[in-house]
């Protein structure tokens, strides 16, 4: 009977133990970029992407409420395991919306080299 009781207590205690979760490379890289964002502010997105070394799987751009013809932010989504992570970029200069929105809709927001290349020369104002 004692063995049964000890075994039951042991099983319940295992459920309460929190395992240390190791962060994967994608999470580490994204956190690194956010922590060192000063390195990328005022520079083309190409600098950030070169350091990141991970291709985005989805790109979603946003417009300010008062002007839907331009883009002022873009979210670059990355996938690792079953989780999605993203980096948001606020652009120094507004980007013309027409061409980018057409690409995003045609590809259902999946990242393409064509779209990434458009953003590479755009200057980063902030990273979050």
Language model regions located:
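Bacterial Sec-dependent N-terminal signal peptides
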Residues: 1-24
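Residues within mature, well-folded domains
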Residues: 21-128
């Amino acid at each position: 009977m004692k063995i049964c009781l000890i075994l039951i207590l042991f099983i319940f205690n295992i459920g309460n133990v929190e395992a240390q979760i190791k962060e994967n490379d994608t999470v580490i890289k994204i956190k690194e970029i956010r922590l060192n964002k000063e390195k990328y502010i005022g520079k083309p997105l190409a600098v950030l992407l070169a350091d990141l070394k991970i291709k985005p799987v989805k790109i979603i751009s946003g417009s300010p409420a008062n002007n839907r013809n331009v883009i002022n932010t873009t979210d670059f989504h990355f996938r690792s395991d079953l989780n999605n992570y993203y980096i948001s970029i606020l652009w120094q200069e507004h980007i013309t919306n027409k061409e980018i929105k057409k690409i995003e809709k045609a590809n259902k927001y999946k990242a393409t080299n064509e779209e990434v290349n458009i953003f590479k020369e755009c200057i980063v104002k902030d990273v979050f």
